[in-house]
Amino acid sequence: MPLTPTPSTRPSRPTSFSMSGPTTLGVRLTSCSSSLRSSPSSSPDSPTSPTSSTTGSCPKTPPGTPPLPRTSRTARPSSCMMLSCITPQGRSLTSFSSVPSSRRSMPPLSFRLSRASRISRSIRNFTASVSRVLTLSMSRRATQPPTTRSRVRPSTGSRPPVSPLVTSSSPSPFSTLSARSIPSSSSVAALPSFRPKTSLPSAFRTPSPSPLLPPSTRTFVTGWSPARCTTRSSIMSEPSAPFGLPTPPASSGLRSASLSTAGSPLPPGTTFSTSRSRPPPFVPTPRIPFSSRPSLACPTGFAPTLGRSGAWLPPRPLSLPGPLPVPSAGSSPFTPTVSGCSASTSSAGGSGLVSHSMAPSQGSFGRPIQPAARQCSLPTQPLSAKSLLVWQTGVLPPPSGRVCSPRPLRRPGSPTQPWP
């Protein structure tokens, strides 16, 4: 029965054989350091082991002794090992194997140095190309004006400042270094100037793009005072344009100075001085109807009084109440007219006629203020000359018609007192 050797090789270790079959009679292991020539005998009658002829001296171990230990790690590559086994039939099997070197295969130092130099050279070439591209892009960005618009907030001076840092949209990480370039004078004119933040009250703020007021309106706002009941002799100035409407064409230069999107520089004469001139603060005044405030030209007895309930009472007569006398034939009837303001007496000629007519004054912003709602009934009986004289001197008889009592607007917490 032939034996089948099963080789199992491992790196950095000697080659070993495992024999499968019946129990061997003797094992003889021989290791030599030179070339080995073995000639096994094929005759079954030879009781001896296979004859081995070597050119060098090889130590031999008798059968039954344990095998030699493994070769050390410092074994030379030319070492060899011979294993001979004796079978029960007398056949001998000799195997020859060479032990590889136990040293690990490492490349030489020169090869390693050349590989490191090649890697470092490629890294150097890559960094040089990247730096070349970066310097080229920086030089291009420095020569070209920036294309992105930056918001410039104008100061109180005549020229807006120049923004030193312009936002760039380049994906390179070093683009912010090149963005710190001051743009040229041609690109400064293209930057738009936005409206400055003015501290106007809420009543003066308008959604129009021009925050500057025309000259006539600005002088009117400066000299603005709470509205009063005026007589015919006083004249109320009216603004040239309301605040909510766009300004007239005369102020087109001021409007272009506040918001210039075409890219033209500011006119030499226009400055932002109008943003510093603040109008007086808006003080809310009580909305008292003009009819409730009497004129200073009226007599003292003509002024009505304010009752405790808040309603206007008829004026107190200074003479004894009585029926109105019948007017004479030469006297003209008296027809008072109510037009929404306090009456002012004016004598017409020598006839002694009193006309209670007043034109409503304009509001502070060009809007007529609505007078108090009245429903007055005119006197049905005509007045005589004596009654007219009583009216002129201040002695008032009780009126024959219904008393006109408007509803004034009272502020909470203020005491009710009659007008002087």
UniProtKB/Swiss-Prot annotation:
One of the GO BP terms on file: transport of virus in host, cell to cell
Stretches with biased composition (Polar residues): 137-157, 253-263
Composition skew (Low complexity), residue ranges: 1-18, 30-59, 158-181, 327-348
Top-level lineage group: Viruses
UniProt-annotated stretches for the region Disordered: 1-77, 137-181, 195-219, 235-281, 327-370, 396-420
Key words, A-Z: Transport, Viral movement protein
Ranges of biased composition (kind: Pro residues): 60-69
Function noted in UniProt: Cell-to-cell movement.
Protein name: Putative movement protein
Organism in which the protein naturally occurs: Maize rayado fino virus (isolate Costa Rica/Guapiles)
